[in-house]
């Protein structure tokens, strides 16, 4: 007994023509017995990091390049290594086996069979076998050889040597003596190699005929050739004899790619077929045997009997056999996955251990045992009553048959073989097939047909000679007999005329194609023409005498070489190389409306790809240019020699160019491969559909199949490869009276196998066909359809960086590229952190321990622990699902590196009855919650930065999916869809206006707003005559009002005008409602609907006018009617939208909050629907909303109000308003009793998203001017104090664009069908259907980009809710609390503790979102810890983020989230930033003064729309410093010149800003006495208000320029700095000191002071006071620092310290709110659009002026 492992060899074939055309790279390398598989070239970082796979085998055959003689392994080498060893074992009496494994086209058949010039393993083995027999045979030793040849296809065994053909399938039985065997398999005796060759040739012909008749793919069948060698040994002396019997099995397995390839949605179920069962089971058997050999499972069950193949090969796998395996692989990169699968398969197989024994003298023993069994069975049969006689009888017949076969003499076997060979020859001759074994190498003088087959082993194997009159058909009387789908009993005739002309005449209803063109009349044939009969009988005609050289010359003269079709191409060569694929492609291209759908698809995709490529390359070039510019700026001449700088720039430039080139090459490569794949798939799909339709029509199944297009599920994920084709063919199966099912190509392939079997049984009238039919189910249409993919929801995981919970309703994108509902998910980080160093540079290659954390153990050694992160995924519910797929919905996803998919099942409570309402079908609840622990690596960080968690949502079709499509429920769904569509492009924002007046305490306090029923503006402001006023404008987003990603960045300008007086009794009140933009939206919407209606009318008319309507036409008509009805509903929605429908212009269906107007005006941004980009620069006079004028606004004059300050916590601006500039009698006098004053406040805001643009918002306000409140009014005010309102507002609905789906003429499903059908006609705009569909499908990229943006903004909102430090207004759904803030802070300062006084600085727009993405304590050695920061007069000049040290690398998709100001640095500044000094040296002071003179030259900011008016500029006495904003170069100069921290700036308003120093507050001494607290003033400008007591001199307009002096240090928390006054101080020397501040002031809890809170005036905390003493000025500001100094625990407002609330308490506390202000009498700038009169003529009539609601 010999225990040996299975020998495994691997052979790599040369590149084929297709791979050479695609320029694919070779990824396989062989050295000795090692095979190295390199990862294919990829444009992702993960691809670059993949290591090569190394495998070791017994033999590695390099057959790539024949010219490399030292390395090349030919057929002879393969035979010597494998064949000779097998042959030797066979002669020793061992069983032996060789099986070839690999994907289709990898060279299995070539290795096993070869061809005439290069014989393969089997012919060489047989030849060597008989050569050795000839040498060794003598008197004492004789040899007998028998062969059998069978095919296993779809779990059925067919005898290829059977003369009756291989139609009948044989049964596999297992005998306890013989083991598994095939009952009835021919075992023929042979005496020479020629006999074997003849039998194999005839067997292959039978196989070809059967495969062609049934249209089976021979590459999907297994062929087993058995050679049984019997050695008889004679002892001449004693006369005894003994036998050795060995069986050699040569197995050519089916193509393995069916198993290794997985479908788009994970491993697709192989439905309805056993085609892959054998290979799958073989893999399981090999794995089980490998585990047994490794000692893992000695008793592990080996599933031999699960498939016919493994059952028959039981002895060869792990049993009594010497087995070798040859694995054939492709070297091409595009076959990487299949190659890897094959190598892994072979790697496991080499571990199998077989136990071979010599089979000595088995016959005598077998015969004896069989005879004993026969006697026992006869006895049982006569005696047994309990057992059923038929079973025993069958067993008895089986054993007797075996005995008979074993006792047949050798001579009888030879006679039987001869008789079978003659019968087969007669049968082949009757079919018209030549018996020549040499294939098509026949006489030169004969005309013949040769078959074309996809399998190279069967191609051109059958030769049919033509007579003068040849009849072709299925009837036995025909000269050439063909059987199969579409072949008529009498199909066609071929005639050869006397002059040599050959013609083909098809019969009626007999499908005949010549060169792909369907022919109905007599057609002349030429040499090389391709003929198709029926569905799948392809032939090529060979006419040796008629090569038509003369005719070709004439043809070439007449036809341009550039423009000839396939027909001409076929005639261009006398010896054309036309294979099966060419003929098949030719038929498909010419059958479908004589058009090439594949070419259309390819052309459209190529055109769009080139456009994308050009755009992307341009963007790439600009990006690299920006990088180079930054490098040039960083390389200062002082630091580096000029030569090194230029070298570095040259190198950078070269590297940038290389990157662009490499990126373009990789993208081109991927695109070429994708196009080739799409072409193959479309050809294949059309072929399969044609055959399925033939079968269904023949068998009257009332089922129709057609090709449609869909997006592969893998391409709906954000993790997909970029540049891949985003569409794939799919099959629509439709049965009359039933719904439509969508099948994959693989599914139809598998179904077709059962269809063919059923068809064959139906043709042969097999009585058990019905029984088999019932058992298998109907392969034409599924009664119980399996689950369908509803769509894929992409959850971007950036929130794991930020440690915030992402709660979001993720859109589910369907395979037609539409949103098919929303999945409500929650993703959060439970434990673990993102490491700082890795976060800073997750691509650093020099850190070997990047995925671990350094920890010092007890012994002092540094050990590395793996960093872990736990994140939780919760799936709550799916809403808005399509009603047809809302049965049994479940979710499936794979998180990061998890091996298995996670399935989330829906919540089903059997006790609760399902609700009957229609809406219930739209929502499915889940209770899925799962935690994942992952190791933090660079790859994982890259995944959460760039990738997404793709959750697939699956569902089953509802039972009533065949109901009429325009039912009421369907219309409800349409309305819901309409709401969802508009929800994606709309967002609401509120504009609140309040007016502040100077009160008796010197504070600006909000005036009251009296509300009344007849007031439409929200209320009437009660203004006191002659008081100084300010206007405060606040812009807020409205939560849950739409999913448009809207970001209001800042208020740019505030203007006021259009003063109108109205009678309360005689005239209607005015408000802020206008319909300019709403009318524009409705007009655009109506235009789109009119286009669709015209198109639908035309299509319906076209279909209706058809005299004979096909099934397709009727369904098309039904779909058109459905769309027409839906269009009517949509048109109604345009004109009369239902209240609360979410459609712009819908009647207000809400109760507005106090002060809010009821009606909601619309503003239309008119952005590009694809990517929400603006077609032009929407700034200044082109800003959105400029022309959205209100009634009575025509020709009115507006005045620009200087902005005093911006708010830190929201987008809010306070502007000074001097009402006298209007020169209006109505504003200067007390308002009469029955009169009301109306004004319009116009606010220009900066949007950063959805596009960088300016937006003009208008709010009409009503005012009443009084002199003094009467006693009654005063009493009323006190009684109703609680309900007093101080601000009024209006809600705007912002519409970015018309929903894209509205403009689509066909629904996506129909468009996909029309595109796949490749209809010639175009749509109204000249585009073809395929172009429309492809453009629509390519929008998935945009959907994902916008979704990335929406989720990123949601994360930022979550951050702002968690800690109020983001100073911008963010607006997206799913977050309840929004922190709106001002983006123009000037810098960032830190105190001794190493944490910032500012909550956060977002002025550093050049840095990425990472600056605010994480929290963490700033390291003590941070370069930003020094007190002397880098000041900047430019708010955006900072280039280093304060959070750089502990935030992750910016995700690539966060670039668009940066404020647009960084991109528009050349725009006029919003405001200037003067500097606060700390303890300056004289030199620094001089530098400062020099810079300040420079800055004086710049002008204050004026919006572009006011450029035509005189600039408002206050005249300031003795003012040397004019606040302004310098450009970027001044910023850099200033950073270099001065080294200190900046603070809030004064604004270019002509007013002074009250600023206190925030420099080292914790270092200042505080006296312990009750004397006044002191705080230094270092600002260059201080605005002083008049305190109660002795008045100050009126020229208090300048602050001291003296350097700060520190008074001393104390132990208390509150510190002061005293500043000595100059001689020309604003305070007179005799000014007495005000009263001390109460002691409570010094005991206030500490907190972080925001820069803007240092402004004097109505501050937020209300603890700001000023005291003036002789000789010095002190300003006190009490800071509030958290007791716990950990920056990570700072919670801001969410901790309950609501600082805003403290401001209200400060009224009536004069000692705490002393303000020194001196308002100069400034005039505003009159503002009026230059073209206002031209665009909008003045309307006098009240009725015209009032907007219609």
Swiss-Prot record:
Domain of life: Eukaryota
Residue numbers carrying Phosphoserine: 636, 1274, 1441, 1477, 1481, 1524, 1600, 1650
Domain (FHA): residue spans on this chain: 469-519
Basic and acidic residues: compositionally biased ranges: 1421-1430, 1719-1741
InterPro entries: FHA_dom (IPR000253), Kinesin-like (IPR022164), Kinesin-like_KIF1-typ (IPR022140), Kinesin_assoc (IPR032405), Kinesin_motor_CS (IPR019821), Kinesin_motor_dom (IPR001752), Kinesin_motor_dom_sf (IPR036961), P-loop_NTPase (IPR027417)
Membrane-spanning residues: none
Compartmental location: Golgi apparatus membrane; Cytoplasm, Cytoskeleton, Microtubule organizing center, Centrosome; Midbody; Endosome membrane
Pfam families documented for this protein: DUF3694, FHA, KIF1B, Kinesin, Kinesin_assoc
Alphabetized PROSITE patterns for the sequence: KINESIN_MOTOR_1 (PS00411), KINESIN_MOTOR_2 (PS50067)
Protein's UniProt keywords contain Cytoplasm: yes
Keyword terms, alphabetized: ATP-binding, Cell cycle, Cell division, Coiled coil, Cytoplasm, Cytoskeleton, Endosome, Golgi apparatus, Membrane, Microtubule, Motor protein, Nucleotide-binding, Phosphoprotein, Protein transport, Transport
GO MF assignments: ATP binding; microtubule binding; microtubule motor activity
Matching SUPFAM superfamilies: P-loop containing nucleoside triphosphate hydrolases (SSF52540), SMAD/FHA domain (SSF49879)
Domain Kinesin motor: 5-352
Reported function: Plus end-directed microtubule-dependent motor protein involved in intracellular transport and regulating various processes such as mannose-6-phosphate receptor (M6PR) transport to the plasma membrane, endosomal sorting during melanosome biogenesis and cytokinesis. During melanosome maturation, required for delivering melanogenic enzymes from recycling endosomes to nascent melanosomes by creating peripheral recycling endosomal subdomains in melanocytes.
Complexes and interactors: Interacts with AP1G1 and AP1G2. Interacts with ZFYVE26. Interacts with AP2B1.
Protein name: Kinesin-like protein KIF13A
Lineage, top ranks: Eukaryota, Metazoa, Chordata, Craniata, Vertebrata
């Amino acid at each position: 007994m010999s225990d040996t492992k299975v020998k495994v060899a691997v052979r790599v074939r040369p590149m084929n023509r297709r791979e050479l055309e695609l320029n694919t790279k070779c990824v396989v390398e062989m050295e000795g017995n090692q095979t190295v598989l390199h990862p294919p070239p990829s444009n992702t970082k993960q691809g670059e990091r993949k290591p090569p796979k190394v495998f070791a085998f017994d033999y590695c055959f390099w057959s790539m390049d024949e010219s490399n003689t030292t390395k090349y392994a030919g057929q002879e080498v393969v035979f010597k290594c494998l064949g000779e060893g097998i042959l030797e074992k066979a002669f020793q009496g061992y069983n032996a086996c060789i099986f070839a494994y690999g994907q289709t086209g990898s060279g299995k058949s070539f290795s096993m069979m070869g061809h005439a010039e290069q014989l393969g393993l089997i012919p060489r083995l047989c030849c060597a076998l008989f050569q050795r027999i000839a040498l060794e045979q003598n008197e004492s030793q004789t040899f007998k050889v028998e062969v059998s040849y069978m095919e296993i296809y779809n779990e059925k065994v067919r005898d290829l040597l059977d003369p009756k053909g291989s139609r009948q399938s044989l049964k596999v039985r297992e005998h306890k003596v013989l083991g598994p065997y095939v009952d009835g398999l021919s075992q023929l005796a042979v005496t020479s190699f020629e006999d074997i060759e003849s039998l194999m040739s005839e067997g292959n012909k039978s196989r070809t005929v059967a495969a062609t008749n049934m249209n089976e793919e021979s590459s999907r069948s297994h062929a087993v050739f058995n050679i049984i060698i019997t050695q008889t040994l004679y002892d001449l002396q004693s006369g005894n004899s003994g036998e050795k019997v060995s069986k050699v099995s040569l197995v050519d397995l089916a193509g393995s790619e069916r198993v290794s390839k997985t479908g788009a949605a994970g491993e697709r179920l192989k439905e309805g077929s056993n085609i892959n069962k054998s290979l799958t089971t073989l893999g399981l058997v090999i794995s089980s045997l490998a585990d047994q050999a490794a000692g893992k499972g000695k008793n592990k069950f080996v599933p031999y009997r699960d498939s016919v193949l493994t059952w028959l090969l039981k002895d060869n796998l792990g049993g009594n056999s010497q087995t070798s395996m040859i694995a054939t692989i492709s070297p091409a990169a595009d076959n990487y996955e299949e190659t890897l699968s094959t190598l892994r398969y072979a790697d496991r197989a080499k571990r199998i251990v077989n136990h071979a024994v010599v089979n000595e003298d088995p016959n005598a023993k077998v015969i004896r045992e069989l005879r004993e069994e026969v006697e026992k069975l006869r006895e049982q049969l006569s005696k047994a009553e309990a057992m059923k006689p038929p079973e025993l009888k069958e067993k008895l017949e089986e054993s007797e048959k075996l005995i008979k076969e074993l006792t047949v003499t050798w001579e009888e076997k030879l006679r039987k073989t001869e008789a079978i060979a003659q019968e087969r020859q007669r049968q082949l001759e009757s079919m018209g097939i030549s018996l020549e074994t040499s294939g098509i190498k026949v006489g030169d003088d004969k005309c013949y047909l040769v078959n074309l087959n996809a399998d190279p082993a069967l191609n051109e194997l059958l030769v049919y000679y033509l007579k003068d009159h040849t009849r072709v058909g299925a009837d036995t009387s025909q000269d050439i007999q063909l059987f199969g789908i579409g072949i008529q009993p009498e199909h066609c005739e071929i005639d050869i005329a006397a002059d040599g002309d050959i013609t083909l005449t098809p019969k009626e209803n007999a499908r005949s194609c010549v060169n792909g063109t369907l022919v109905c009349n007599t057609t002349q044939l030429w040499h090389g023409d391709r003929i198709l009969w029926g569905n799948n009988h392809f032939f090529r005609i060979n006419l040796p005498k008629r090569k038509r050289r003369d005719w070709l010359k004439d043809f070439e003269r007449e036809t341009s070489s550039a423009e000839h079709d396939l027909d001409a191409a076929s005639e261009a060569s006398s010896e054309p190389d036309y294979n099966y694929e060419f003929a098949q492609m030719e038929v498909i291209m010419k059958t479908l409306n004589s058009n090439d759908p594949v070419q259309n698809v390819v052309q459209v995709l190529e055109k769009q790809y080139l456009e994308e490529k050009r755009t992307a390359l341009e963007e790439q070039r600009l990006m690299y240019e920006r990088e180079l510019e930054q490098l040039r700026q960083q390389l200062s001449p002082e630091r580096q020699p000029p030569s090194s700088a230029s070298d570095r720039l040259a190198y950078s430039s070269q590297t940038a160019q290389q990157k662009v080139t490499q990126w373009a090459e990789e993208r081109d490569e991927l695109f070429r491969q994708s196009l080739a794949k799409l072409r193959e798939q479309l050809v294949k799909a059309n072929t399969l559909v044609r055959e399925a339709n033939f079968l269904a029509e023949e068998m009257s199944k009332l089922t129709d199949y057609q090709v449609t297009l869909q997006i592969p599920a893998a391409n709906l994920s954000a993790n997909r490869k970029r540049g891949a084709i985003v569409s794939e063919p799919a099959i629509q199966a439709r049965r009359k009276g039933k719904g439509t099912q969508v099948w994959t190509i693989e599914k139809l392939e598998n179904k077709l196998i059962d269809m063919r079997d059923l068809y064959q049984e139906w043709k042969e009238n097999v009585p058990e066909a019905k029984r088999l039919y019932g058992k298998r189910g109907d392969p034409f249409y599924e009664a119980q359809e399996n689950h369908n993919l509803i769509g894929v929801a992409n959850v971007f995981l950036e929130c794991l960086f930020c440690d915030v919970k992402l709660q979001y309703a993720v859109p589910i994108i369907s395979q037609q590229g539409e949103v098919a509902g929303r999945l409500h998910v929650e993703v959060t980080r439970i434990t673990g952190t993102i490491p700082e160093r890795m976060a800073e540079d997750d691509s650093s290659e020099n850190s070997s321990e990047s995925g671990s954390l350094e920890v010092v153990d007890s012994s002092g050694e540094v050990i590395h622990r793996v960093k872990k992160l736990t994140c939780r995924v919760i799936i709550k519910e799916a809403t808005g699902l399509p009603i047809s797929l809302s049965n049994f919905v479940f979710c499936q996803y794979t998180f990061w590196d998890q091996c298995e998919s996670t399935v989330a099942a829906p919540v089903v409570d059997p006790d609760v009855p399902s609700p009957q309402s229609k809406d219930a079908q739209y929502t499915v609840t889940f209770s899925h919650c799962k935690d994942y622990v992952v190791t933090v690596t660079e790859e994982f960080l890259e995944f959460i930065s760039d990738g997404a968690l793709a959750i697939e949502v699956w569902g089953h079709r509802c039972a009533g999916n065949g109901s009429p499509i325009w039912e009421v429920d369907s219309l409800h769904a349409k309305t819901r869809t309409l709401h969802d569509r508009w929800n994606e492009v709309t967002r609401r924002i509120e504009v609140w206006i309040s007016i502040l007046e100077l009160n008796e305490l010197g504070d600006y306090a909000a005036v009251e707003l009296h509300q009344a029923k007849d007031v439409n503006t929200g209320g009437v402001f009660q203004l006191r005559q002659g008081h100084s006023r300010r206007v405060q404008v606040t812009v807020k987003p409205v939560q849950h009002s739409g999913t448009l990603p809207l970001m209001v960045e800042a208020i740019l300008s505030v203007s006021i005008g259009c003063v109108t007086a109205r009678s309360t009794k005689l005239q209607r009140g005015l408000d802020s409602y206008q319909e300019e933009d709403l009318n524009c939206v409705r007009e655009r919407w109506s235009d789109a609907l009119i286009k669709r209606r015209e198109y639908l009318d035309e299509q319906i008319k076209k279909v209706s006018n058809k005299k004979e309507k096909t099934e397709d036409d009727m369904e098309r008509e039904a779909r058109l009617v459905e769309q027409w009805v839906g269009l009517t509903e949509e048109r109604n929605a345009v004109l009369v939208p239902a209240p609360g429908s979410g459609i712009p212009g819908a009647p207000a269906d809400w109760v507005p909050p106090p002060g809010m107007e009821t009606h909601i005006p619309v503003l239309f941004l008119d952005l590009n629907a694809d990517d929400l980009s603006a077609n032009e620069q929407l700034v200044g006079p082109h800003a959105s909303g400029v022309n959205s004028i209100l009634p009575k606004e025509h020709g009115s004059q507006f005045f620009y109000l200087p902005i005093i300050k911006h708010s830190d916590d929201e987008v809010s601006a306070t502007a000074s308003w001097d009402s006298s500039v209007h020169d209006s009698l109505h504003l200067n006098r007390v308002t009469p009793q029955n009169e009301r004053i109306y004004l319009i406040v116009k606010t220009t805001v900066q949007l950063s998203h959805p596009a960088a643009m300016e937006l003009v918002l208008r709010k009409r306000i009503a005012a009443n001017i009084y002199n003094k409140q009467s006693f009654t009014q005063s009493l009323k005010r006190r009684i109703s104090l609680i309900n007093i309102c101080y601000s009024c507002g209006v809600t705007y609905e912002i519409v970015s664009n018309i929903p894209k789906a509205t403009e689509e003429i066909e629904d996506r499903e129909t468009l996909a069908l029309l595109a796949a059908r490749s209809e010639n006609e175009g749509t109204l705009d000249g585009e073809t259907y395929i172009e429309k569909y492809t453009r629509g499908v390519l929008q998935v990229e945009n959907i994902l980009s916008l979704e990335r943006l929406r989720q990123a903004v949601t994360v930022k909102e979550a951050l702002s809710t968690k800690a109020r430090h983001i100073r911008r207004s963010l607006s997206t759904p799913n977050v309840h609390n929004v922190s709106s803030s001002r983006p123009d802070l000037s810098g960032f300062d830190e105190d001794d503790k190493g944490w910032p006084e500012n909550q956060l600085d977002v002025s550093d727009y050049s840095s990425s979102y990472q600056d605010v993405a994480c929290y963490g304590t700033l390291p003590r050695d941070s370069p930003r810890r020094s007190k002397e920061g880098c000041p900047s007069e430019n708010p955006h000049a900072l280039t280093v983020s304060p959070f750089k040290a502990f935030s992750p690398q910016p995700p690539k998709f966060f670039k668009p989230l940066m404020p647009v100001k960084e991109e528009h640095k050349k725009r006029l500044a919003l405001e200037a930033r003067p500097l606060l000094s700390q303890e300056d040296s004289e030199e620094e002071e001089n530098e400062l003064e020099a810079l300040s003179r420079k800055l004086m030259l710049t002008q204050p900011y004026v919006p572009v729309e006011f450029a035509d008016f005189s600039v408002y500029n206050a005249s300031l006495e003795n003012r040397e410093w004019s606040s302004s904003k310098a450009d970027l170069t001044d910023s850099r100069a200033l950073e270099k010149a001065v080294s200190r921290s900046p603070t809030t700036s004064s604004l270019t308003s002509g007013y002074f800003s009250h600023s206190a120093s925030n420099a080292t507050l914790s270092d200042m001494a505080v006296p312990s006495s009750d004397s006044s607290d002191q705080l230094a003033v270092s600002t260059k400008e201080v605005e002083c208000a008049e305190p109660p007591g002795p008045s100050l001199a009126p020229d208090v307009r300048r602050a001291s320029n003296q350097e700060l002096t520190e008074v001393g240090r104390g132990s208390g928390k509150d510190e002061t700095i005293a500043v000595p006054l100059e001689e020309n101080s604003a305070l007179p020397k005799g000014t007495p000191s005000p009263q001390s501040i109460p002691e409570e002031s010094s005991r206030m809890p500490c907190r972080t002071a925001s820069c803007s809170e240092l402004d004097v005036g109505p501050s937020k905390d209300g603890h700001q006071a000023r005291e003036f003493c002789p000789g010095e000025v002190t300003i006190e500001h009490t800071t509030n620092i958290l007791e716990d100094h950990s920056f990570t625990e700072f919670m801001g407002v969410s901790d309950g310290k609501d600082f805003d609330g403290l401001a209200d308490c400060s009224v009536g506390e004069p000692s705490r709110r002393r303000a020194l202000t001196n308002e100069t009498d400034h005039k505003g700038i009159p503002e009026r659009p230059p073209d206002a009169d031209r665009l909008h003529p003045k309307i006098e009539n009240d009725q015209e002026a009032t907007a219609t609601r």
